[in-house]
Regions:
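Helix-to-loop junction immediately C-terminal to a conserved catalytic motif
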Residues: 51
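Conserved ABC transporter NBD signature motif
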Residues: 59-70, 74-75
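Conserved ABC ATPase "signature" region
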Residues: 99, 103, 110-128
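Conserved ABC ATPase signature
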Residues: 132-139
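A short, proline-enriched helix->beta-strand linker immediately N-terminal to the Walker B motif
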Residues: 151-155
């Protein structure tokens, strides 16, 4: 399928630190790509660079085959960008903010009013449409912000943390809304929510230190990871000697100690019983065993966990 957005060896440096490290990939038209990773992994920098707000030190970004930096006006007209934090004009009501935004895109008055009505209904902020932004909760500001992003009907959407500050019911409403756009819009969004990334994506990108650590559909990434299990054994007292002995077992992967808990990964369930034999004389508080999921994939492919 044709790529709607393409990156060619894109690199970005901020304060002497590489935040995007030579990224090259294409994003299929009409698909949804979720970008996850620890803080400062490059997620926000990626969206700002695709939008054209941040110029890369090297490389190029293309939207519909047009260079974002060289053909700024043409590409900006087809891109909607939603920042993580609301940036409404505090002197205008939500309705006036949306009106102003639509006029920037030269929307006809009748179409503009129709779009405002339908989006405010669909995203659940119509009853607050004539209120000032600061009087709304952060959740309703987020809904209105999403409505503003979709208002001029752009076909490329770049969204930072679409459901941050929303309650669970509102999260599901936004997820359903985004999935309704599949096929007609190319959506790239960043998130700290494991549940969100698992639920809403055609493609999942895990970033770490400006690089793509993993890229693909979740079930394929899990399949490629093979059988991987995460174990946690909570002892009443975990001595250094016991920790060292358990860590030396060759089938134990990435062992660590968190308080009195021995945390490790393994390719086979039987490794858990091998470890328990070493600790048979010790008093246990609890234990847990889980097959690898997205959260574990992120932890094992990045240097820091998502917080």
């Amino acid at each position: 399928m044709e790529a709607s957005v393409s990156l060619k060896k894109v690199g970005k440096v901020l304060n002497g630190r590489s935040v995007l490290a030579g990224l090259s990939f294409g994003i299929e038209r009409g698909s949804i790509m979720a970008v996850v990773g620890p803080n400062d992994s490059g997620k926000s920098a990626l969206l700002k660079t695709i939008a054209g707000f941040s110029k890369p030190e090297y490389g190029s970004v293309f939207i519909d085959g047009k260079d974002v930096q060289l053909r700024r006006i043409e590409t900006a007209s087809v891109v909607g960008y939603m920042p993580q934090r609301a940036n409404f004009d505090s002197q205008l009501t939500i309705f006036e903010n949306l009106q102003f935004h639509g006029r920037l895109y030269l929307m006809a008055p009748q179409l503009l009013n129709s779009r405002i009505a339908s989006l405010s209904d669909r995203l659940g902020f119509r009853e607050f449409i004539h209120d000032f932004p600061h009087t709304l909760s952060s959740g309703y500001q987020k809904r209105a912000l999403l409505g503003r992003t979709f208002l001029p009907d752009p076909h490329v959407l770049l969204i930072e943390e679409p459901t941050a500050s929303l309650d669970l019911r509102a999260q599901y409403e936004v997820w359903d809304f985004l999935q309704e756009m599949r096929g007609s819009k190319t959506i790239i969004y960043t998130t700290q929510s494991i549940r969100e990334a698992e639920r809403v994506h055609d493609r999942l990108v895990i970033m770490d230190h400006g690089k793509v650590a993993l890229d693909g559909k979740l079930d394929r990434l899990l399949e490629n990871a093979g059988e991987l299990f995460h174990f946690q054994i909570h002892f009443k007292k975990l001595s250094k000697e016991l920790y060292d002995n358990m860590s030396k077992v060759t089938t134990v992967v990435s062992p660590s100690q968190v308080g009195e808990v021995f945390d490790f990964y393994a390719r086979e369930r039987e490794v858990f019983f091998d470890i328990m034999k070493l600790a048979i004389q010790e008093e246990l508080v609890d234990y847990a065993a889980d097959k690898v999921g997205l959260e574990t994939l992120i932890m094992t492919s990045t240097e820091e966990p998502i917080r």
